[in-house]
């Protein structure tokens, strides 16, 4: 590798809007903020919202007279 052409790979602190913080390594060089992390994302917490698709289908059928 050529010397002095690669960015510094430093430890940065990532803070989430839910209050969770963790450290990782990055070339960004400064601490940064994210809106969603694994501690608060619905996929990882198991609190997923179920979309009412049956209600939408019924509304469509009533509106267009199908079924």
Swiss-Prot record:
First and last residue of the signal peptide: none
Textual note on the cofactor: Binds 1 zinc ion per subunit.
In this chain, Zn(2+) is annotated as bound at 16, 18, 37, 40
UniProt cross-references to InterPro entries, sorted A to Z = Ribosomal_bL28/bL31-like_sf, Ribosomal_bL31, Ribosomal_bL31_A, Ribosomal_bL31_sf
Q: A single Gene Ontology molecular function, please?
A: metal ion binding
Give the required cofactors.
Answer: Zn(2+)
Q: Which GO terms describe its cellular component?
A: ribonucleoprotein complex; ribosome
Keyword terms:
Metal-binding, Ribonucleoprotein, Ribosomal protein, RNA-binding, rRNA-binding, Zinc
Q: GO biological process annotations for this chain's record?
A: translation
Superkingdom classification of source: Bacteria
**Biological role:** Binds the 23S rRNA.
Q: Which HAMAP family match?
A: Ribosomal_bL31_1
- UniProt subunit comment: Part of the 50S ribosomal subunit.
Q: Which family does it belong to?
A: Belongs to the bacterial ribosomal protein bL31 family. Type A subfamily.
Q: What is this protein called?
A: Large ribosomal subunit protein bL31
Q: What gene codes for this chain? A: rpmE
């Amino acid at each position: 590798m050529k010397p002095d052409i690669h960015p510094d790979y430093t430890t940065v602190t990532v803070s989430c809007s839910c209050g969770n913080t963790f450290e990782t390594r990055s070339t960004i060089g400064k601490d940064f903020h994210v809106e969603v992390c694994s501690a608060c994302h619905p996929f990882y917490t198991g609190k997923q919202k179920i979309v009412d698709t049956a209600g939408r289908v019924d509304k469509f059928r009533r509106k267009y007279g199908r079924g």
